[in-house]
């Protein structure tokens, strides 16, 4: 099969389209499915892995990447199932998150995928998993947003951000989204109670306080947002592995036991949340 492969870390030039051994189910697989990939997407996750930033190298190899096929989001049809798979059958249209999805075939756990709704195309489904699951984990699992809380989402028109706006609104929060001028209207249409044009206004200087600040674009530091938090509020960044101050501030928060600071990444690829 053909796949997008990187055998060393670096710029886009390290990516090559190569013929590699076709992915297949193993005799030891119990809960895996084989997916014929119809569509995939590109996320910051892929960029950080290809470039080989330090947090990535800790898990994926310091010199040479262990996982050499790119991709995490997938949409396609099930080609085969292992013995204990009960939720899916051959031919099902599915989407989800699994490593190595920039290829013609990929193995995935049944717990990491879901059936694509009939009114959704493969291309539309492929852009959902990573960003939507990250937003769910931030708003539902980490922040545990409740009705009446004030939530600020930086990057409210981005991939993670626009899902976070809708999810926070679903849980009854009063949602403020920060985005650019051209996106103010549609971000309000999808559920934001208030919108702030970051080009014209700095939310840290308007005197308002929020129970939760989610930086979905890693555009601001915790330290710059701290004065905009309520006494028991906290800040989350969706890109804790971003080079520079973001990783430093998350580590500092852990070392100082500062409960106001949390780094959130895609840690669970649960299909039930899709």
What are these regions (language model features)?
Residues 23-41, 54-100:
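Glycine-rich beta-strand-centered segment in the early N-terminal region that forms part
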Residues 48, 63-73, 80, 93-155:
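NAD(P)H dinucleotide-binding glycine-rich loop of Rossmann-like/cofactor-binding domains
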Residues 95, 196, 213-214:
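N-terminal Rossmann-like NAD(P) cofactor-binding module of classical short-chain dehydrogenase/reductase
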Residues 125-197:
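Mid-domain Rossmann-like dinucleotide-binding core that forms the NAD(H)/NADP(H) cofactor-binding site
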Residues 204-212:
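A short acidic, Gly/Pro-enriched loop at the edge of an enzyme's catalytic core
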Residues 219-274:
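Glycine-rich phosphate-binding loop and adjacent beta-alpha segment
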């Amino acid at each position: 099969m053909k796949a997008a492969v990187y055998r060393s870390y670096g710029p886009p030039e390290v990516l090559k389209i190569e013929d590699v051994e076709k992915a297949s189910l193993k005799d030891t697989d119990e809960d895996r499915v084989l997916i014929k990939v119809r569509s995939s997407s590109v996320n910051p996750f892929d960029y950080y892995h290809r470039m080989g930033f330090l947090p990535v190298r800790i898990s994926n190899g310091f010199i040479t990447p262990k996982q050499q096929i790119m991709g995490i989001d997938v949409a396609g049809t099930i080609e085969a199932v292992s013995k204990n798979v009960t939720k899916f059958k051959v031919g099902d249209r599915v989407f989800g998150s699994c490593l190595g999805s920039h290829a013609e075939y990929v193995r995935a756990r049944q717990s990491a995928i879901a059936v694509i709704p009939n009114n959704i195309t493969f291309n539309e489904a492929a852009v959902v998993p990573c960003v939507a699951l990250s937003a769910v984990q931030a708003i539902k699992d980490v922040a545990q947003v409740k009705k009446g809380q004030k939530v600020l989402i930086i990057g409210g028109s981005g991939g993670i951000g626009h899902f976070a706006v809708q999810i926070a609104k679903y849980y009854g929060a009063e949602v403020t989204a920060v985005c650019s001028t051209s996106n103010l209207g549609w971000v309000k249409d999808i559920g934001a109670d208030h919108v702030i044009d970051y080009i014209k206004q700095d939310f840290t200087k308007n005197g308002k306080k929020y129970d939760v600040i989610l930086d979905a674009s890693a555009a601001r530091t915790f330290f710059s947002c701290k004065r905009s938090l309520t006494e028991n509020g906290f800040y989350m960044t969706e890109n804790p592995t971003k080079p520079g101050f973001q990783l430093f501030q998350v580590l500092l928060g852990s070392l100082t036991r500062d409960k106001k600071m949390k780094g959130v990444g895609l840690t669970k690829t649960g299909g039930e949340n899709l």
